[in-house]
Amino acid sequence: FAYGWLMQVGIDQGYMPIQPIHYSHKIHSGANQIDCQYCHSSARVSKHSGIPSLNVCMNCHENIAEYDGEEDLEKGYTKDFYTNEIKKLYKAVGWDENKRIYTGDVEPVKWVRIHNLPDFVYFNHAQHVNVAGVECQTCHGPVEEMEIAYQHSSLTMGWCINCHRETNVNVKD
C-alpha cells in the first residue's frame, strides 16, 4: 500500500493556475522562438529552474510596449489584451514608459507555482539539462504551444523511474 501511495504523491497533472500577469509561452517560446533557458537561466546551474525575475522580462519589454502579433479573438486574446498585460508588468517593476525610467514604485507579483514536488523528492534541473541533455519539453510538454502554462506530466516517482529506465540511466554509480 505505502509503495503504491508514494508512486502517486503530488499528482497535479493538468494543473493550470491563472497567473496575476498573463504570460504566453506560445508567443514567447513559440512564435518568437525565445529559448527556455533565456528566461529560466538557473535551470543550467541550479537544482531549481525558478520563476524568472521581472528584470528578465524588461530586457525586451523596455522596448516592446505594445503587442503586435497574432490574435485569438475566439478566446479573447486580442492585441489590447496582451498590451494590457505588458502594462501590468510595467506597473509591477515601476517602469514609466513615457519618461522611460524606473520610478522605484514597485508592486511584487505573486506568481502561482505550477510544478510542486514533495520535499522528500530530490530533483536537480542542472543535472538533467547539462549532464543528461534532457529537453525541457520532455518533462514540461510542448511549452511553445501553451497559451497558459500547465503541468504537462504527472511528475510522480513512477513517471520519473520509467524515464530513467527508458533512457538507461546509470543509477548505480
Regions found by a protein language model. Give the residues of each.
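Primarily the internal scaffold of c-type cytochrome electron-transfer domains
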Residues: 55, 64-121, 169-173
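Early transmembrane hairpin module of multi-pass membrane proteins
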Residues: 8-13
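Hydrophobic membrane-insertion alpha-helices, especially the h-region
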Residues: 1-4
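Sequence context surrounding c-type heme c attachment/ligation sites in exported
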Residues: 17-69, 118-173
